[in-house]
A protein has these predicted regions:
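N-terminal loops that bind phosphate or other acidic moieties
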Residues: 1-208
């Protein structure tokens, strides 16, 4: 099984709807340890992405991903714009001219994107950031390469949720939350949460 470029477009469309629905939830999380703008920023950025989708729906997956990244870079404020923008731009590098992706190609695409996040944000596993959720996703996908496409995504979603919730007892080492020191402990990281929501949308789109 593969994921088609039409399903990639559907993924981004679903993500826009999810970030619209979850704007207040993400902002409430960010109010505890950040600038209280993560939900607003993610919603605004992905609404702009959604507006661009009709213009790239017939393009290859790499072009779709790169356009998404450039749109997020120009429309999201705070730290999340550069990080998510970089994720999509770097993800595009291995999927230019691709019309569909198998599980290995999808995993490599996501790995390239996460490598970009790490290089840009300098976050490591355990720093209480979106990198924690991405690590859970990629570790799971790499272990499930012989599993069916949807089963592999299902297991990765479960690991993403575990990693997201795993940020609650951590002390933040990066971003605005790090200024709180030990007071950041006990709160779920907003970026780890938006990454979980984004990947959950990918799983949903792949099943359609």
């Amino acid at each position: 099984m593969t994921i088609s470029k039409q399903q990639v477009v559907r993924w981004l469309d679903l993500a826009a709807e999810i970030f619209k629905e979850q704007q207040d939830f993400l902002t409430d999380l960010d109010r505890e340890i950040g600038d209280a703008d993560h939900g607003l920023n993610m919603n605004r950025g992905f609404q702009k992405v959604q507006e661009k989708l009709p213009g790239v729906a017939d393009k290859d997956i790499g072009t779709i991903m790169k356009t998404t990244g450039m749109t997020l870079l120009s429309s999201i404020g705070g730290a999340s714009g550069p990080l998510y923008g970089t994720f999509f731009i770097r993800s595009a590098t291995s999927v230019m001219a691709k019309e569909e992706l198998n599980l290995a190609e999808l995993t490599q695409m996501l790995q390239n994107g996460v490598d970009g996040i790490v290089q840009r944000g300098k976050a490591e596993i355990g720093d209480k950031t979106m990198v924690d959720t991405w690590h859970g996703i990629l570790e799971s996908l790499n272990q499930e390469q012989e599993t069916s496409f949807i089963d592999a995504l299902d297991r990765a979603v479960a690991e993403a949720e575990k990693a997201m919730k795993g940020t609650i007892p951590l002390q933040a080492k990066k971003g605005r939350a790090s200024y709180l020191g030990e007071r950041s402990i006990g709160h779920q990281d907003p970026g780890a949460t938006s990454t979980y929501l984004l990947f959950s949308a990918l799983r949903s789109a792949a099943a359609q």
